[in-house]
């Protein structure tokens, strides 16, 4: 008889915990952060330095991109402009107003329009990025990679950085502000 009471209490505790944990988990994954496995060579050596033998898993922060707080050097997950069923992970090279020297895009120089980003893979020869499809709308950004969480040997925070040879030539909006500043 005592066994039956224990079993019922255990079952009730499990069910009540389940009905609390599931909505909390769904909310966290939907609003705050989620994890993604990085496949391919486009972000080497920053991500997946060993190739497919040990793919990196990253924590993607949704909260930081909700209000379009994206900066140069961030690694972001975006919906592919060419295939909306696919998410791609790339580095932000330019933000709105920046002039970018492209790598094989139809125009040699591009001004990133308002509400857009210029994204590129770190491994230029193996990346399908803005050099192929142009600037990307901020609305396509799903998250900013904040940490590598797998494999354990690579646990680390991901800091924003832009390779020196890929920095924007000029930010048109900032140059206009400097030109007309009355200080």
From Swiss-Prot:
One of its GO terms (cellular component) is mitochondrial inner membrane peptidase complex. PROSITE patterns: SPASE_I_3. The active site is at 42, 90. InterPro entries: IMP2, LexA/Signal_pep-like_sf, Pept_S26A_signal_pept_1, Pept_S26A_signal_pept_1_CS, Peptidase_S26. Residues 164-183 have a biased composition (Basic and acidic residues). PANTHER family: MITOCHONDRIAL INNER MEMBRANE PROTEASE SUBUNIT 2. This is Mitochondrial inner membrane protease subunit 2. It comes from Danio rerio. The lineage of its organism: Eukaryota, Metazoa, Chordata, Craniata, Vertebrata.
